[in-house]
Amino acid sequence: MKTVFAVLFLAFIALTYARSYEDVKEEIKNEVEKEILEDLEEESDDLNDKSKEINDAKPWRWVRKIRWRRLVPYLPAVIKAAGKK
């Protein structure tokens, strides 16, 4: 949503300072292309980071795969049972 407002704001600036309609169209087109390319770069960086994470050998990987939300409700009972010993 922020990018939409940024593009509209830049389009407004382009309209106020442009010499002709063609300049405005070219400016808007350039800004949209720039935003799309930046988004694609961010997504490719995210994909590269994920692939590195999967391919890295990490000894504590099993800890990350534990479903902590399912285990959290049982923690007080486990602590209570451990405290009775």
From Swiss-Prot:
Its main location: secreted. Residues 1-18 form the signal peptide. GO terms for cellular component: extracellular region. It is found in: Secreted; Target cell membrane. Residues 19-57 form a propeptide. It comes from the Eukaryota. The keyword Signal applies. The keyword Cell membrane does not apply. The modification Alanine amide is found at A82. Antimicrobial peptide with a broad-spectrum antimicrobial activity. Keeps its antibacterial activity under a wide range of salt concentrations that mimic physiological conditions of human blood, which is surprising, since Hydra is an obligate freshwater animal with nearly no salt tolerance. Does not affect red blood cells. Belongs to the arminin family. This is Arminin 2c. It comes from Hydra vulgaris (Hydra).
